[in-house]
């Protein structure tokens, strides 16, 4: 049994059982992957994949267990490499972050700028996607950190640490009836067509919860994953925008009026997460603390030592988080 064989079967699953696509991603040949998979199956005396002709159709029940263990083994191999790197080149390496557009565009720029200035030999890569894609990227080892607000049930296998609270703002054009108000009620908001986030992105579930709590149905006419896109359609008069308050920039958005929405919506909490098997390099601890100053190395280590995210929630329940 070879590590290469374990890597092949994991990557085949990551590529939805498409061996051709797997070969392209690994810069190798399709026959080479198929041969190594067969050799592993022959050695184990069991099928990892069911087949129809030359095509893989599904992972067998035994294969699912083997894939799970293979992921753990490969994760440990990565951890060994990280330990070695920490001792030989502590300021050199890579960092892969999976997050949403709102975090990438509004919460992370200054953090990343300072981080790159401090660690010029660390290559930083960002993957933007939906909460499902973010969770998938980290759980499969394609990203080191997940930074997210929504769909936290997708992150049960990760250590999730609370970073900051944030709320929403209502944005309208200067000639809109709501533009002259300092605050509005949810009943007033329900009278207008809304332009907001796609469900599952950037606190959208809290918007739906607030309307359900009030016994109202929001009239959502347009959704997008990108706050900048939402603001564009607000400018076109399509509706009232409901976006993260951090996404409203007085300098970049002088043609929009912001109305506070703290009285309508409860705050949301953005968290940063990583696999329990991840060996955190010194620069990774530093990135976490730059993003969330209360998450010092000692605090992170104490949280990792806990058995579940429920225990982590209890650990942080009396800590006042920053607000954005």
From Swiss-Prot:
Intracellular or extracellular location(s): Cytoplasm
Record InterPro entries: LysR_subst-bd, Tscrpt_reg_HTH_LysR, WH-like_DNA-bd_sf, WH_DNA-bd_sf
GO BP terms in the entry: cysteine biosynthetic process; DNA-templated transcription; regulation of DNA-templated transcription; response to X-ray
Keywords: Activator, Amino-acid biosynthesis, Cysteine biosynthesis, Cytoplasm, DNA-binding, Transcription, Transcription regulation
DNA-binding region: 19-38
Subcellular location, principal: cytoplasm
The organism's place on the tree of life at top rank: Bacteria
GO MF annotations in UniProt: DNA binding; DNA-binding transcription factor activity; identical protein binding; transcription cis-regulatory region binding
GO CC list: cytosol
Pfam family of the protein (one): HTH_1
Domain spans labelled HTH lysR-type: 1-59
Functional description taken from the UniProt entry: This protein is a positive regulator of gene expression for the cysteine regulon, a system of 10 or more loci involved in the biosynthesis of L-cysteine from inorganic sulfate. The inducer for CysB is N-acetylserine. CysB inhibits its own transcription.
Family, as annotated: Belongs to the LysR transcriptional regulatory family.
PANTHER family the record matches: HTH-TYPE TRANSCRIPTIONAL REGULATOR, HTH-TYPE TRANSCRIPTIONAL REGULATOR CYSB-RELATED
Assembly and binders: Homotetramer.
Name this protein carries in UniProt: HTH-type transcriptional regulator CysB
């Amino acid at each position: 049994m070879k590590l290469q064989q374990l890597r092949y079967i994991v990557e085949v699953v990551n590529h939805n059982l498409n061996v051709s696509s797997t070969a392209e991603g690994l810069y190798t040949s399709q026959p080479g992957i198929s041969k190594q998979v067969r050799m592993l199956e022959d050695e184990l005396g069991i099928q990892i994949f069911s087949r129809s002709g030359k095509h893989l159709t599904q992972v067998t029940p035994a294969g699912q267990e083997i894939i799970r263990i293979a992921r753990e083994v490969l994760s440990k191999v990565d951890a060994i490499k990280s330990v070695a790197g920490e001792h030989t080149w502590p300021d050199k390496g890579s960092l892969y972050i999976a997050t949403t557009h709102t975090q990438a565009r509004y919460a992370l720029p200054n953090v990343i700028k300072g981080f790159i200035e401090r660690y010029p030999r660390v290559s930083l890569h960002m993957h933007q996607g939906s909460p499902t894609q973010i969770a998938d990227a980290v759980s499969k080892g394609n990203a080191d950190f997940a930074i997210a607000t929504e769909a936290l049930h997708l992150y049960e296998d990760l250590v999730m640490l609370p970073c900051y609270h944030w709320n929403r703002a209502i944005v309208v054009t200067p000639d809109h009836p709501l533009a002259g108000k300092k605050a509005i009620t949810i009943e007033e908001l329900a009278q207008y067509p809304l332009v907001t986030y796609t469900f599952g992105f950037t606190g959208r579930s809290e918007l739906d919860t607030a309307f359900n709590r009030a016994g109202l149905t929001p009239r959502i006419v347009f959704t997008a994953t990108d706050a900048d896109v939402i603001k564009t359609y607000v400018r076109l008069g399509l509706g009232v925008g409901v976006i993260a308050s951090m996404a409203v920039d007085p300098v970049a958005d002088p043609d929009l009026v912001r109305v506070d929405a703290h009285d309508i919506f409860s705050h949301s909490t953005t968290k940063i997460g990583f696999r329990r098997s991840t060996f955190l390099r010194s620069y990774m601890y530093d990135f976490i603390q730059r993003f969330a100053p209360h998450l010092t190395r000692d605090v992170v280590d104490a949280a990792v030592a806990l058995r579940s995210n429920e225990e982590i929630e209890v650990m942080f329940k009396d800590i006042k988080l920053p607000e954005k």
